[in-house]
Amino acid sequence: MASGRRAPRTGLLELRAGTGAGAGGERWQRVLVSLAEDALTVSPADGEPGPEPGAVREPEPAQINGAAEPGAAPPQLPEALLLQRRRVTVRKADAGGLGISIKGGRENKMPILISKIFKGLAADQTEALFVGDAILSVNGEDLSSATHDEAVQALKKTGKEVVLEVKYMKEVSPYFKNSAGGTSVGWDSPPASPLQRQPSSPGPQTRNLSEAKHVPLKMAYVSRRCTPSDPEHRYLEICSADGQDTIFLRAKDEASARSWAGAIQAQINALLPWVKDELQALLAASSPAGSQDIKQIGWLTEQLPSGGTAPTLALLTEKELLLYGGLPQTREALSRPARTAPLIATRLVHSGPSKGSVPYDAELSFALRTGTRHGVDTHLFSVESPQELAAWTRQLVDGCHRAAEGVQEVSTACTWNGRPCNLSVHIDKGFTLWAAEPGAARAVLLRQPFEKLQMSSDDGASLLFLDFGGAEGEIQLDLHSCPKTMVFIIHSFLSAKVTRLGLLA
């Protein structure tokens, strides 16, 4: 696989750093974005995060526990505190991390020093840590000769309870009295689950970036259509395959956003053969009776009933459409999709704009309906480009036809005129009703080819109506469960037969 050492593209963009006060008070930080073969790196650039035009600038978080307002003297600590090592236990909340920034490191010939403590977060709540404290160890791990990066990693990999051994460094504390820099170690990753958001929300908020952030491009999700409230079309969202790393960027104009999205997607696409090979191997290992070929894989943006959206990883095999919240990395994860749609009972009902009221991005959307024993499941998805829409449309239609040709025949128990029967539907032989009374001979009660079928319908509960014309007219079959699966299979057989005859392009 690509090494990621070459950076084919770099440039300055803005990173969404949170929300500020006032209307439209989103805060953006200027960052340097580097696109390599297998990762996207976002690093701080010159300039502080700023609010949207017209918004009220938020004050900087106050440095507490002795780090006073700009120009103030460093904290006055008891003399005994200056002479001893201290052990402080920090209990992290679910969000916010430790709530400190650090400076120093072996490469700077300095100890690891607390340069900022954020008000209200875990470190602040101990009331026992101070700006100017040197961190000597973390949970027993010695940091006395650690580099800056080693210290950051040691702090990040801690659990809910962190034991810090510290010592106050009086001689260096004045250096931090006006400091707003340092490395924040409070970046907590979101949970690995589908990122759901409402139409008014542009996505998960990111805290101020003070160190490089790397997003792996292997099966990453990229979207320029993450929010309808983007009149200038400048927004860009990138999410790692497992949902752990998400960044939300803003380009200078629509052309720049389109260019960056295309370049990032091209790098992701270059890694697809490796992803497909890995998943194919997992699929073969989890299906000892014979594996299915993966026909298509990619991210879709699903329109949720609530009005929001969620990135959904779709994997199309010869028989099924499998939907996941993230990239499955194990056989167990691959065998447990969030949803499964058997292609033989699935129908593409529209691709592109539909009639009537349509949701955001309808021009790049498609809808699927699947017949199940509980009724009809309907899902609406959107993609990022006309090329993606065409590819998914073609693969889904072809997949439904392949599934129909592969299955050939389905059967189900039913009742006809009060008599127990079995209904068999064959793609070539048509419809056959067999007697199913206990002990009775397997007699054929009715046989009709597909060509005689004039109409089919159902009541959505248990009844299937088939009209073959002639003397029989319409027959009514009670399938004893929701008939939608059989209705959709009949449609797939018909569609496959029509396509086989070359009546559709």
From Swiss-Prot:
Tissue spec. comment: Highly expressed in skeletal and cardiac muscle and is also detected in brain.
Protein name from the UniProt record: Alpha-1-syntrophin
Gene name for this UniProt entry: SNTA1
Membrane topology: Peripheral membrane protein
Gene Ontology terms for molecular function: actin binding; calmodulin binding; structural molecule activity
Compositionally biased residues, Low complexity: 9-18
Function: Adapter protein that binds to and probably organizes the subcellular localization of a variety of membrane proteins. May link various receptors to the actin cytoskeleton and the extracellular matrix via dystrophin glycoprotein complex. Plays an important role in synapse formation and in the organization of UTRN and acetylcholine receptors at the neuromuscular synapse. Binds to phosphatidylinositol 4,5-bisphosphate.
Record note on modification: Phosphorylated by CaM-kinase II. Phosphorylation may inhibit the interaction with DMD.
Keywords associated with the record: Actin-binding, Calcium, Calmodulin-binding, Cell junction, Cell membrane, Cytoplasm, Cytoskeleton, Membrane, Phosphoprotein, Repeat
Source organism (scientific name): Oryctolagus cuniculus (Rabbit)
